[in-house]
Structure formats: structure tokens, C-alpha cells
Amino acid sequence: MTPILISGFSVAVPVAIATDLLFATISKVLGVAIHGRAGRVDWKVTRALWSGSLPGVLVGSLVLVGLVTQGATNWLMWLIVVFVALTGWTLLRRGFQAPVTMRASQAPAPRWLAPLGGAGIGLGVSLTSVGAGVLGMALLVRISPRDTQPQRLVATDLLHAIPVAMIAGISYTFSGLVDWGLLGTLLLGSLPGVVVGSLLSGRVPGRVMSLALGIILVGLAVVLPLT
């Protein structure tokens, strides 16, 4: 949502990041409540990711608040462009790659990969609000058992992202960066979609969704520097 807020609605970069993080927290809570009720969450993997992502998001939040205080936020746009492009590339790669191929040759992941990867995601999300879902999913595919069902991966990814977005969002709330009117408008339009999307997960071909979203994100990565 951050790239759209910046390029389509001319929202200031720090405000877009802060507002999008709170928006993501609320919408993901609703989604994971539906998935969690079905018993789909892998708590062991989630805790391993949190061991790295929560410290990472705390560090990133402190960095961003410090930069905003000093007025040194120009480089945030380029960091967002990098994360949007990386997220789009990950989605396109997933869309063009057969699911069986992605996991058939996968060796067991080293135990340090989940905390280290989680730390990178936490740091990046707190500075850009981009990539928690897609990059988190790419990491989950690598560290989860080969026979993990897609619905379980989705639910685990959603649950992992909630405190990551929430901690950063709360930090930015106390810094006065959240646009509450904009947040309310976003939630008004999105929450019905979250409910429908969670209930329909698994019925829409994953490769089609990955390709469509990947193309959109790569396009946004090209447009953002021009705004």
C-alpha cells in the first residue's frame, strides 16, 4: 500500500510508511483469525522467525524515527523502490516456477536461517512497510517442511507479520507520523476484502495471483522514482 499512497495520493513517505504499517496490522489480524480458527498456523516456525524479526523491527523503528527527527528521509524513497522491486521479482519468480520444483530439491534449512532472515525482514519492513508478506513467504517456503500445505504457509506468514507491523506502527504513532483519517478510509474499503480473500484462499490459482501482483509491483518500482 505504501507505494500507492506515495505515487497515487502524494502522501509523504514517512507518513505513508507509518499509516500502512498500522493498516497492515489490523487487516492481518482479521485474516489470521480466520486461518487460525482452522488450525493452520505453524507456531514453531513462527517463533523462530520472531526471534529475529522482532529485534530487527525495533532497531529499524528507532532508525526511522531518528531520521525523521533530523529531516534526513530522502533516501527512504529509494529503499522502498528496492524493496518493492525485490518483492515483485519474488512474486514473478514464484509465478513462473512450478510448485513441485520449488520444494523437490530443497535441502533442510540451517537453524540460523529463520532468525537471520526474520531480522532482515523486520529491519526492512520497519523502514519501508514493504515485503513482510511476500519476502516472509519466500523464507517460509525455504525453512518449512516439504509437505507443508500452502494454507498453512499463508496462515503462518500472516501471524508472523502481525507483531512486526504492530511494533513499528505503535512506534510511529507516538512519533505523530500516522494519518488517522487516511487509515480509517483504507480500513473501510479493505476489511470486507480481507474477509472474502481469507475465505477464498486456495481457490484462486496461486501462480496467477503471483504473476499479477508481481507485474503490478515491478511497475510501481519503475513509477515511484518519477513521482
How should these model regions be labeled?
Residues 1-2, 133:
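Extracytoplasmic
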Residues 2-8, 13, 34-127, 138, ...:
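Juxtamembrane transmembrane-helix boundary motif
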Residues 7-8, 19, 25-32, 36:
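Generic N-terminal helix/loop capping motif
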Residues 11-22, 42-48, 145-158:
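Membrane-interface alpha-helices at helix entry/exit sites of multi-pass transporters
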Residues 22-31, 53-59, 63, 159-167:
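Membrane-embedded alpha-helical segments of transport systems
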Residues 111-171:
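Structural signal for alpha-helical transmembrane segments and their flanking helix-loop junctions
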